[in-house]
Amino acid sequence: LPVALAQETATCSYEVVQTYPHDQNAFTQGLIFDQGELYESTGLEGKSSVRKVDLETGKVLQISKLDDRYFGEGMTLWQDRLIQLTWVSKTGFVYDKETLKQIATFSYPTQGWGITHNHQELIMSDGSNTLYFLNPNTFKETKRIKVTENDRPIDKLNELEFVKGEIWANIWLSDRIARIDPETGVVTGWLDLTGI
């Protein structure tokens, strides 16, 4: 019998249309642009924070620093709350978007890498090929999907975004972003960001 050939997944490129100054010492883990405001989650133990940044100048306008034991990771905006993960401490933080005051904490059983939402549930990655869907009020898992391309697992899923009905995940230590079907976990396309 003939061997079935794996179908090539479409790859898109990019065009840089604008550049902005940025704090070179910030180990960026998540970015959110909302109503003219730029929010950033930064990592590294002893240097992790959530900050509001002036897009045009790169100046930090507000900052909320994490305790030194936490390594900040991905972040998403849910209603008027910023939700930030930490890497290995299995602890997440909830902040008031306006004041950056920490208003709640929550826990999860895996590492925390990236987070986004689909307007109904939070979606979290842990560096594996699994995406976890969480209730945004209780932070309890509601389902999970395995991410694959041609039936092969795609792991190292890092920060996430929800774009036009798809989950976009950057792949740690690569220049690629996977476009993922949120129902099946199948990679439907790639963005190749080589050169940025």
Protein language model features and the residues they cover:
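A short helix->beta-strand "capping" segment at the edge of beta-propeller domains
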Residues: 7-25, 55-61
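Beta-strand-rich domains and repeat architectures in extracellular enzymes and scaffolds
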Residues: 17-49, 64-76
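Short coil/turn segments that connect the beta-strands within blades of beta-propeller domains
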Residues: 35-36, 79-81, 119-121, 164-165
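Conserved beta-strand positions in repeat-built beta-propeller and related beta-rich domains
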Residues: 39-44, 82-89, 124-128, 169-173
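Blade-loop segments of beta-propeller domains
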Residues: 58-94, 100-112
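Surface loop/turn motifs at the tips and blade-to-blade linkers of beta-strand repeat domains
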Residues: 19-24, 63-68, 104-110, 145-152, ...
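Short loop/turn segments that connect beta-strands within beta-propeller blades
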Residues: 54-58, 96-100, 136-139, 181-185
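Beta-rich catalytic cores
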Residues: 26-27, 46, 69-71, 88, ...
